[in-house]
């Protein structure tokens, strides 16, 4: 961040880690956090596209809070998830209804995991499930009737 000095004033720059402590910000730059007399000149953030030169300290802290509330799987696949969600806030709002299948690479893996976690099928033996359950058909059904995002590190089941 740097101050926006008027003619003849010295420009002060300082690097802050998030979340930004407002008191430290005001002390280091010598201006109020609400003044708007500063601008962001550099940033290294996963959600950098949502931060602009005039983003306020409070907005930065809010974005940082939302990002930190995402699961580690969602943080790891943040860029992929943004192909489905409009922005960080939209992802943050839906974070608790997104189901992550971190060990799944294909939809058949998801079908198997769903079956293993479904109490309806708990009483069936593994042999019975393996021989009589059509995982390919169930995977196709899931894909046709659900919304999934397949990533390098797992599969995300998204809200409709």
Q: Model-found features: residue ranges?
A:
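Acidic, proline/glycine-rich low-complexity IDRs
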Residues: 112-160
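Charged/polar, solvent-exposed surface patches and flexible loops
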Residues: 27, 31, 65-68, 80, ...
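Short, flexible beta-strand-to-coil junctions
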Residues: 2-8, 45, 152-154, 158-160
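Structured domain cores in non-transmembrane regions
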Residues: 22-89
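Extracytoplasmic/secretory-pathway segments with low complexity and glycosylation-like composition
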Residues: 78-79, 83-120, 137, 159
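Intrinsically disordered or highly flexible coil/loop and linker segments, enriched in small
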Residues: 7, 72-76, 148
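N-terminal ordered "arm"
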Residues: 1-36
